[in-house]
Amino acid sequence: APLSSSDYIEFLGEMNDGKPDKALYRDQDFQLNDRYSLETDTAAYFLTVNTAGGNLRYTTAVNTAPSAATPDAYFMRSIDIHYKKILNRGYANRVGEYVYSSAYDPGEGFTFGDIIPSSPMQERFVPLNLYTAGPANGFSVRVNAAGNAENTRNLKINVNGPTGTEIYNVGMPFFTYRKVAINNLPLALLTNTTNVVIAVTNVSGVSTDRLVVASIGITYPSTFNFNNEKKFY
């Protein structure tokens, strides 16, 4: 039925993201953060109204709930945090000082700030609303990171803080990058049903070494409690 004088339309608009930027990189895999555009955050939306009816893109759908349906106890929730603290310049050549190309290079884009060996990065995910009876290996962790100095190092990832369970420790020397996706982790790693801390550590013998993190994400079984959030998935 047409909208009455008391009805309203709730409209959600999102800023432009960085997905179209992928084609600008010399290798599209170099892009570590596609949430934010390097060109513009502007997006345009148009709402049109046809008072005569017969709209092209809107049709009335029947929303009939099935009888005797059993509600799902949980769903697999993904939470991804994309950082925009600094604009990392990516790969560099040392010619007396670091010199950067005009090309879109590995690691170039928005990231968290530089992470040095003495200061691990810690990201707390809260509230989880964990469904503890979910799949036994239903926990996943994702990290996109890159080196930011001409040194050797390992990228180390821990669950439950820097001294918690180590789930990844692999070399990422110089300006190389890693897109880490660790699946089928034990759900028992989530010892706290309300929050979890994912820690990223720069393991290097050079105290001034640097790495950057573009994004951190997790997937886990969650109850249908969204804490009054307006946007979730």
Predicted regions and their residues:
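Structured catalytic cores of large enzymes
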Residues: 1-233
